[in-house]
């Protein structure tokens, strides 16, 4: 069951590595829990691969004991997807931000 915690403001890879260190899991062990290769996880942590799909983020979050929303990029992706369905809100926000 995922722990309750504050949202991370760090980049995806930094957050994954921090959580791995916190629970004492290696790339190989996390790979076994998620079905992802240790090499791929290493690339994610070091920023050599883009942030994965929401489904992969959800899998990683569960294995690391957090909610998917813990990851900044997951929150941003969710916001973007919802905003795309509301073009009038995009325009209002844009004007309000003075952009």
Label each residue range with its predicted role.
Residues 20, 31, 61:
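The alpha-helix within a helix-turn-helix
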Residues 28, 39, 69:
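Key DNA-contact positions within bacterial/archaeal DNA-binding proteins
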Residues 17, 28, 58:
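Residues within the helices of the helix-turn-helix
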Residues 35-51, 74-77:
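Recognition helix of helix-turn-helix/homeodomain-like DNA-binding domains
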Residues 55-70:
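DNA major-groove recognition helix of helix-turn-helix/homeodomain DNA-binding modules
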Residues 72-99:
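Short, charged recognition helix plus adjacent turn
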Residues 1-25:
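A short, Lys/Arg-rich alpha-helix, primarily the initiator
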């Amino acid at each position: 069951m995922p722990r309750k915690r504050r949202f991370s403001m760090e980049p995806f890879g930094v957050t994954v590595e921090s959580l791995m260190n916190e629970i004492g899991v290696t790339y190989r062990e996390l790979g076994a829990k998620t079905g992802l290769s240790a090499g791929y996880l290493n690339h994610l942590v070091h920023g050599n691969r883009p942030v994965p799909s929401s489904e992969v983020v959800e899998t990683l979050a569960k294995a690391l004991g957090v909610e998917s929303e813990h990851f900044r990029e997951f929150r941003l992706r969710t916001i973007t997807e919802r905003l795309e369905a509301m073009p009038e809100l995009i325009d209002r926000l844009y004007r309000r931000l003075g952009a």
